[in-house]
Each structure stands twice: as C-alpha cells, then as structure tokens.
C-alpha cells in the first residue's frame, strides 16, 4: 500500500462518508450544508474529533436540516471510535502497532481522558466491534491470493472470528477477469451469464402472457434441480443446442445469435418480446424454452461454485434474479454460522457493449457465537 492509499484509509476511518464542512474559528462553529453546529469548549483543541463527530451525526440523522442542539460526547469517545475503525479496517490491520496508535493519539487526541470507554455506537460498554467488513480486490497481483484466503476462512468460524474480530457481515468484491486471468473459466462465465439473462427475458414475457390467457394447459416438465453438479459443462451446452435444434432450428438459432451479442436493455427487451410471441401457445416450444433456461442455470451455478471454491457443499437457496447486465444468486451453506449468502455477478463493458470483466460481489452474514478453544 502506498502512502496516498494509506492516508485515504485513515481519513475514511475518521469520517466514513465524506460530508462538506468548514470550521469557522471566529465563531467556533462547524458549518455544513445541513446546519451550523457550535463547537463546545472541550473540543476546541480537537478539531479533527469535532469534524468526526459532526460527520457521524450527518450520517446517522436523516433530517434535511438539523436544527436541534447536539449532545456532544466526551472527545475521548470519538477518538475511541476512530481507533476502533482503524483496528478493524481490512487494509490497515497490517500497519497497526503500539507506535502507530501512539502517533495517532499525539496527532489528534493528546491529553484525552484514558478512562473513557466505549464508542459513538455503544457508550460505556467497552469498545464496539463493527458489524461489517468490506474487501475490494480488482488488481491482478493481489486478487487470487486475497480471494482464496477469504474463502479458506469462510467455513471456519474460529478463523473468521480471530482474524476479523467477531464481525457478522462481510462484503467481498473482486474482478473475475483478474481472478481468472487465463484459461476458459472467465470466458465461460461471461457467456453463460449472457445466455441466462436472454432466456430469463424471453421466459418473463412468455410467463406474463401465459398468466393473462392461461395458455398452455399441457403440463410442462418439472424444472431440474439447478444445484446438481455437471460433470462436463461443455458437453451439457453442446447437447442442449442439438436437442433444441431438432424442435425448431430457426427459432433456437435466433435465440443463440441473440446470446452471442451484448446490446442495450431496450434492444434486449424488444427482441426478447418478439421471440416470446413465437413461443407463446406452442406447448413444445414452451417446454424446450424451460429446458434451455434450466440447463443454463445449471451451468451458471456450476461455474459459480468453482469461482467461490465451494464445489459440492453449497446449494442454491432462494433461486436468482436478474437485470440487463447482472445476476443475483442466493446460496445456502451447510455451516450453521453462515446464515445468508448473496452473490452478485455484474458484467462490465467498454464501448459498443464489449464485455471486459465480471465484477463479483459476495455478501454473507454470520451468526455470532463463542469461539471454540
């Protein structure tokens, strides 16, 4: 980490979300876009802490204009909050030392009462551990090592608790292109995301019209369990294409062509609706569409399990939802301390809808419990 990034992380711990404000020394007030706040005497030598507290108020009070008189805590409480954020910041943990904290106190908290305990979020009850840890890895030299380390800790509550101080919420964001810099996996993921989105669009239009007119009295085959493993992903895709071509080569060929190109959301919806009109009312085509949709979901979930290094022990929990360029998938882990997992796969583009990356956002929640041993 260079000096500029280190300073940015420390500033983030002082004020988690930037708020424009000015300290008027002539009037001893802090002016903001949402109000003016008189600074009490015990904060006049701790301007950084005064800014941090006002920033905390602005972030936690939704009132457009704050007119009430603030209940300013002891400055040491604000200082404790900043230290707590720094200690638990994922990018700063390696820099924390006695000398670092001593220098921090000499800079922004010299002379504070060391007997004051707690933070702004929990006064008088000891240092509060933040309930969220956020990671973002987008550069090739770091992604694979960092992401692999995170997933190796994920299933072991003792490791997570000791490494991340009993946090219960994690958001890991990383570049798939950097994670899978070589090999077929990255390309396969981009392609199956596109195929899944197109089939979701078409199915949405078909189901909407089916609900209106109760079309398709013939029972369709039940949807396959998308979480089962596929031994050979490429074989599944190839056999799928051959099977559908036998039913209606022209129609499925058009869908395949649409899957091969990225374009605007409006263009996708227009073409998907036109194709859906040719499927509605034809029970065989509707059945084949459902098979295709299920197969692409299976391929997607198979690749996703490889991506999060969880083959065979993770199940799709509440299905998935989609937008024009992203898919959200809910997962269920067998470990009891992992209570909820959502994975967001978002395609990133250059000009002319050229896909260049898939940004992965892995969100999980834990159930806090005692550490073994």
Curated annotation (Swiss-Prot):
State any GO CC term. Answer: nucleus
GO MF annotation terms: identical protein binding
Q: Where in the cell is it found?
A: Nucleus
Q: What's its job?
A: Part of the plasmid partitioning system, which ensures the equal distribution of replicated plasmid molecules to daughter cells. The plasmids exist as well-organized plasmid foci within the nucleus that stay together throughout the cell-cycle and act as entity during segregation, effetively reducing copy number to one. Plasmid partitioning requires the proteins REP1, REP2, and a cis-acting locus STB (REP3).
Q: What is the effect of changing residue 32 to K?
A: Abolishes interaction with REP2 and STB
What is the species of this protein?
A: Saccharomyces cerevisiae (strain ATCC 204508 / S288c) (Baker's yeast)
Note the effect listed for residue 177 to K.
In strain: ATCC 44827 and ATCC 7754
Result when mutating residue 149 to D:
In strain: ATCC 44827 and ATCC 7754
**What is the recorded phenotype of mutating residue 43 to A?**
Abolishes interaction with REP2, but not with STB
Lineage: superkingdom: Eukaryota
Note down the stretches annotated as region Interaction with REP2: 1-76
The effect of residue 276 to P is: Abolishes interaction with REP2, but not with STB
What's the impact of mutating residue 87 to R?
In strain: ATCC 44827 and ATCC 7754
Cite the InterPro entries for this sequence: Rep_fungi
**Subunit structure as annotated in this protein's UniProt entry:** Interacts with REP2.
Q: Major place of localization?
A: nucleus
Residues of the region (Interaction with REP2 and self-association) are 1-129
One Pfam family for this entry, by name? Rep_4
Name of the protein in its database record: Partitioning protein REP1
Give the result of residue 154 to S, as annotated: Abolishes interaction with STB, but not with REP2
Outcome when changing residue 107 to A: In strain: ATCC 44827 and ATCC 7754
Q: What else is known?
A: The plasmid 2-micron circle is a extrachromosomal element that resides in the nucleus and propagates itself stably in host cell populations. It provides no obvious advantage to the host but imposes no significant disadvantage either at its steady-state copy number of 40-60 molecules/cell.
Effect seen on changing residue 93 to Y? Abolishes interaction with REP2, but not with STB
User: Which of UniProt's keywords are assigned here?
Assistant: Nucleus, Plasmid, Plasmid partition
User: Which cysteine pairs make disulfide bonds?
Assistant: none
């Amino acid at each position: 980490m260079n000096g500029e990034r280190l300073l940015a992380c420390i500033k983030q711990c002082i004020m988690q979300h930037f708020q424009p404000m000015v300290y008027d020394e002539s009037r001893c007030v802090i002016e903001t876009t949402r109000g003016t706040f008189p600074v009490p005497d015990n904060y006049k030598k701790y301007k950084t802490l005064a800014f941090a507290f006002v920033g905390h108020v602005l972030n936690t009070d939704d009132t457009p204009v704050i007119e009430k008189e603030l209940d300013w805590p002891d400055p040491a409480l604000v200082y404790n909050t900043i230290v707590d954020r720094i200690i638990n910041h994922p990018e700063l943990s390696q820099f924390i030392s006695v000398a670092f904290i001593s220098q921090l106190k000499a800079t922004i908290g010299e002379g504070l009462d060391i007997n004051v305990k707690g933070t702004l979020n929990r006064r008088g009850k000891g240092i509060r551990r933040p309930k969220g840890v956020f990671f973002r890895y987008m550069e090739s030299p770091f992604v694979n090592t960092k992401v692999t380390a995170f997933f190796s800790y994920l299933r072991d509550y003792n490791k997570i608790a000791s490494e991340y101080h009993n946090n219960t919420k994690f958001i890991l964001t990383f570049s798939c292109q950097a994670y899978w810099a070589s090999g077929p996996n990255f390309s396969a993921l981009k392609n199956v995301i596109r195929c899944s989105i197109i089939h979701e669009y078409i199915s949405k239009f078909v189901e909407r019209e089916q609900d209106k007119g109760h079309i398709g009295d013939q029972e369709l085959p039940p949807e396959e369990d998308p979480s089962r493993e596929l031994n050979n992903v490429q074989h599944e895709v190839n056999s799928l294409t051959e099977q559908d071509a036998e039913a209606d080569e022209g129609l499925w060929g058009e869908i395949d062509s649409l899957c091969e190109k990225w374009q605007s959301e409006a263009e996708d919806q227009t073409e998907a609706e036109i194709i859906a009109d040719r499927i509605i009312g034809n029970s065989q085509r509707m059945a084949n569409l459902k098979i295709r949709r299920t197969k692409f979901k299976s391929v997607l979930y198979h690749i996703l399990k490889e991506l999060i290094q969880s083959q065979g022990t993770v199940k799709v929990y509440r299905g998935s939802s989609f937008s024009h360029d992203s898919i959200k998938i809910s997962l269920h882990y067998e470990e009891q301390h992992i209570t909820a997992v959502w994975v967001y796969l978002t395609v990133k583009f250059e000009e002319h809808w050229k896909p260049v990356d898939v940004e992965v956002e892995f969100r999980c929640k834990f159930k806090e419990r005692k550490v073994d041993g």
